[in-house]
A protein has these predicted regions:
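N-terminal amphipathic, basic-rich helices that act as targeting or association modules
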Residues: 1-96, 100
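A structural signal for isolated positions on well-ordered beta-strands in alpha/beta enzyme cores
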Residues: 22, 166, 194-195
């Protein structure tokens, strides 16, 4: 009779214990001074202004959508810090491949505001980006941008470019097949890609607890060999 093997006993313990890296508490207090970024007062003020701008953009876009004046809009409420903080670290040479909820990053990366609204209304010019703007239009298919980001990153590597490709998805996107394909190939080819999961706890109406048994979504990168 075959003996049962406890797979968990064969895995390294740290694969199952990802400690949360935290700089600020929910109340805004510093909990780890060693991780504080070296930012000037002016840079901190700019980041705060960007987040307030994103909240106002969300509120006005939501109002336009409910009035029937804006065709498609995915709310960004509550994700200002993750969206604007991550895009603030990028260079103009870096490529961003957004999902449909990542319009604020596109605008802060250099997309003219009216282009974002043309895209939301389904106008063809909303996908006509300037030649020197390193980004792609928002991906409507959840998680599909992960495969595309891997391809762009691999192209940057092959061409010797000092740049990265960045993409975002939610916790629901991390359950999609394209997500796994993207991180698998990126790990195999060591592509300069940054995969950002914005875990708000829900995939439309499906809670995080029903999407994955993994204690943390970061663990999904272990099998792909991504740090």
């Amino acid at each position: 009779m075959a003996k049962k093997v406890k797979i968990e006993d064969l895995l390294r313990p740290d694969n199952f214990n990802f400690d949360m890296v935290q700089v600020l508490s929910p109340e805004g207090k510093v909990v780890n001074k060693d991780l504080l970024p070296d930012l000037s007062d002016e840079e901190l003020v700019q980041l705060m202004e960007d987040m307030v701008w994103s909240r106002i953009l969300h509120e006005r876009s939501t109002a336009l959508n409910r009035q029937g004046r804006l065709g498609f809009y995915a709310p960004t409420f509550g994700q200002e810090a993750s969206q604007l903080g991550s895009v603030a670290a990028l260079k103009p040479e870096d490529y961003i491949l957004p999902g449909y909820r990542d319009v604020p990053q596109l605008i802060k990366h250099g997309l003219p505001l009216h282009k974002a609204f043309l895209w939301s209304r389904g106008h063809v010019e909303g996908n006509n980006y300037p030649a020197d703007f390193n980004a792609y239009p928002p991906q409507i298919i959840i998680g599909a941008q992960y495969v595309q980001a891997m391809g762009v990153a691999l192209g940057l590597k092959k061409n010797g470019k000092d740049a990265v490709a960045v993409t975002w998805t939610g916790d629901g996107g991390s359950s999609q097949g394209d997500f796994y394909e993207g991180i698998n190939f990126a790990g195999a080819y060591k592509a300069p890609a940054i995969f950002f999961i914005q875990n708000n706890g829900w995939a439309i109406s499906t809670p995080r607890s029903l999407q994955s048994a993994a204690p943390t979504l970061a663990q999904k990168a272990v099998a792909a060999g991504i740090p």
